[in-house]
């Protein structure tokens, strides 16, 4: 039986589809996060969102915390610290940036991740991966329309770039530790420690007198937290499994789909999506395909037999 003209390389397709599904749920959460933040602050939202999600994953584990190996706890704590730092720096950047500007700068993790993998592990990206990164990043530029950025005295821009670097490191670290762990156990430890770090951060911020919005527990906040917890629990299990098989650089390109899904869902919610946004979405999809699919090599022509 002949193989299809187009074939995926290196990894089976299911982990790639799992990452795409995870980015869909992440992208779908933007509107819920925005609504919840009208009645609470980012640290409280992260603490409750990840804490409830950890409880949901604990139910999947049937409460068997004692079965989680020490190395998984350590790996989960390291990943969670990066997740927490990424959320905190990104939220701080949003204090001085518009959503589109923040979205663009945060997406710098797409080109940063394969460069980090190259520098740290010596794994140079393939031509297909470079093509995919360039296309996906160009698409993100069109989606975010960041042309008002100044990079002068706006500290929020630099803090958001730091959050992108942290996200790139987190993707790389998860890709490194995931193969040696059980997906649900790693997901639980990440969620648990992220909630703990957020709680500590909230306590420190409160003690230091940092102005934080008080939380109003209405149906919007409670319902939002429960829904966001379901999403993050499901997504972390998917990521902990799929990143065993998909290299960090390629995973970063796939994660760029988060902006596409957020834009599409925003459009259904009444937000505008112009021609540039549509072209940007197409470029991101093209970047993923460029990195994941290749044409089979042509067989060398048989040499002519000498007479």
What are these regions (language model features)?
Residues 46-48, 102-108, 174-196, 232-267:
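Helix-helix packing/entry segments at the starts of transmembrane helices
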Residues 14-23, 61-90, 155-163, 212-234, ...:
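Loop-to-transmembrane-helix transition segments
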Residues 56-67, 110-134, 260-279:
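C-terminal transmembrane-helix exit sites in multi-pass transporters
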Residues 25, 29-30, 58-106, 113-114, ...:
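Specific transmembrane alpha-helical segments of multi-pass solute transporters/efflux pumps
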Residues 2-6, 17, 48-51, 145-146, ...:
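C-terminal-most transmembrane helix of multi-pass membrane proteins
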Residues 14-18, 44-59, 128-138, 155-162, ...:
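Hydrophobic alpha-helical transmembrane segments of multi-pass integral membrane proteins
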Residues 1-47, 89, 150-176, 198-200, ...:
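Glycine-/small-residue-enriched transmembrane alpha-helix faces in small-molecule transporters
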Residues 57, 77, 125-146, 164-167, ...:
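Hydrophobic transmembrane alpha-helices of multi-pass small-molecule transport proteins
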């Amino acid at each position: 039986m002949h193989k299809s003209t187009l074939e995926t390389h290196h990894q089976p397709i299911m982990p790639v589809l799992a990452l795409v599904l995870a980015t869909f749920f992440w992208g779908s959460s933007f509107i819920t996060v925005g609504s919840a933040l009208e009645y609470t602050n980012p640290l409280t939202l992260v603490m409750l969102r990840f804490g409830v999600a950890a409880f949901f994953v604990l139910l999947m584990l049937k409460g068997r915390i004692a079965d989680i190996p020490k190395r998984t706890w350590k790996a989960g704590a390291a990943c969670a610290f990066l997740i927490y730092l990424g959320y905190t720096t990104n939220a701080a950047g949003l204090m001085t940036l518009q959503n589109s500007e923040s979205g663009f700068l945060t997406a710098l993790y797409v080109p940063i991740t394969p460069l980090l993998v190259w520098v740290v592990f010596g794994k140079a990206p393939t031509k297909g991966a470079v093509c995919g990164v360039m296309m996906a990043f160009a698409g993100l530029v069109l989606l975010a329309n960041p042309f008002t950025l100044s990079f002068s005295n706006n500290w929020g821009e630099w803090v958001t770039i730091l959050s992108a670097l942290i996200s790139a490191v987190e993707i790389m670290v998860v890709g490194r530790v995931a193969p040696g762990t059980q997906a649900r156990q790693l997901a639980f430890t990440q969620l648990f420690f992220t909630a703990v770090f957020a709680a500590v951060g909230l306590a420190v911020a409160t003690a230091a007198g940092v102005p934080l919005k008080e939380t109003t527990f209405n149906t919007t906040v409670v319902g939002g937290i429960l829904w966001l917890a379901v999403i993050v629990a499901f997504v972390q299990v998917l990521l902990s499994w799929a990143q065993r098989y998909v290299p960090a650089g390629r995973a970063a390109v796939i994660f760029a789909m988060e902006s596409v899904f957020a834009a599409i869902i925003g459009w259904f919610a009444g937000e505008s999506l112009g021609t540039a946004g549509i072209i940007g979405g197409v470029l991101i999809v093209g970047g993923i395909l460029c990195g994941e699919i290749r044409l089979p090599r042509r067989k060398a022509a048989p040499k002519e037999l000498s007479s």
